[in-house]
Amino acid sequence: MAKKTPGNNGKQKLFCSFCGKEQDAVKRLVAGPGVYICDECISLCNEIIAEDHEHSHEKSEVFSEVPSPADIKSILDQYVIGQDHAKKALSVAVYNHYKRVNLKEKKSDVEIEKSNILLIGPTGSGKTLLAQTLARIIKVPFAIVDATALTEAGYVGEDVENIILKLIQNADNDIKKAEVGIIYIDEVDKIARKSDSASITRDVSGEGVQQALLKIIEGTVANVPPQGGRKHPHQEYLQVDTKNILFILGGAFVDLPNIIKSRTGIKTIGFGSEEQRIQSENKDVLMEQVIPEDLIKFGLIPEFIGRLPIVATLQELNVDMLRQIFREPKNSVLKQYTRLLELENVKLTFHDEAIDKIAELAIKRESGARGLRAIVENIMLDLMFDIPSRKDIEEVIITAEVIANRVAPTLILKKESKIA
């Protein structure tokens, strides 16, 4: 309500409804229905609006400098060994996705569809690491969710909208940032329907989840419960537009090679270890020939596959690749442990033969790159417990015997004495 007070001449004096200044103290007072605003407050409002517009413009240009596909792959190469085909496919898809986001901000007439990605590869082949690294390169919020925890609405388990909540939380509750983030849905092969024909019974953690994910992956305004959990009618929701969220889905799809083999007729031959090698190579060749019909036969519904235009396959890791993974990436297991011991002024040395044994053990356990850390954690546990309490150790040497036969590592003491 505008402020009015009686003046000396009996006339009412008018005041600005916002700052309280009298009409005589300002250049101009603009009247509205029951309110007044002075020229100074109008100027201040203009400044605030201009500042908001500037910030909005800055947000729309966040991805104006998206790295080129070659630059994205070059950074991926620093963290992930091998998998060149998958890295190229991901680099192009991510580049195009965020260029598409810019295009929408600039209100282009051309509608470019989303480039959601399906990664197919064995456990420990680098699917999650690739997705995490992409989010770091583009500098966007990132969330990982397990598809096996999801169920369709009305059943025990997580609603699919909760995957958006994790992204919001990782974006420091900034919904605008979350709306251009990346979500990695792991173990998506576990939500395949139980057979490739429609079932008359409910498949609440399979086809039902695929159906529930369709709209979110394609792009919709999702109602997200702010505290997570199940939705109920009298609850307030966070509204999140998913049209610019990049979805990367990953899974091992263990039986998929057999489906492709039955379609293509490719056979594997060989004997002993040679047979294993040939089968592994043939499996990689088979996986590269995957087509949508194979995925439908596996148990993904056609509408779901249609929302995943980019399909990239990852190779099964061999001993040579695991050796490289152990040594070479920026955040390799070897470099991490070397740095941890450096902080204690201790040198860490792994013999080449020890690294060979670690790689062979990871292959035997079928745990891929993820298994490397588990093996080394087990070997290094006692050392990592003891070393911070000791100041006499100069170097720790890990030999093949340490890995193969669980003998104690060699410790070189600062007084040149050796304890084996």
UniProtKB/Swiss-Prot annotation:
Gene3D superfamilies: 1.10.8.60, ClpX chaperone, C4-type zinc finger domain, P-loop containing nucleotide triphosphate hydrolases. SUPFAM superfamilies: Glucocorticoid receptor-like (DNA-binding domain), P-loop containing nucleoside triphosphate hydrolases. GO terms for biological process: cell division; proteolysis involved in protein catabolic process. Keywords: ATP-binding, Chaperone, Metal-binding, Nucleotide-binding, Zinc. Residues 4-57 form the ClpX-type ZB domain. It comes from the Bacteria. Zn(2+) binds at C16, C19, C38, C41. One of its GO terms (cellular component) is HslUV protease complex. ATP binds at P122, T123, G124, S125, G126, K127, T128, L129. Belongs to the ClpX chaperone family. NCBIfam families: clpX, PRK05342.1. ATP-dependent specificity component of the Clp protease. It directs the protease to specific substrates. Can perform chaperone functions in the absence of ClpP. This is ATP-dependent Clp protease ATP-binding subunit ClpX. It comes from Leptospira interrogans serogroup Icterohaemorrhagiae serovar Lai (strain 56601). The lineage of its organism: Bacteria, Pseudomonadati, Spirochaetota, Spirochaetia, Leptospirales.
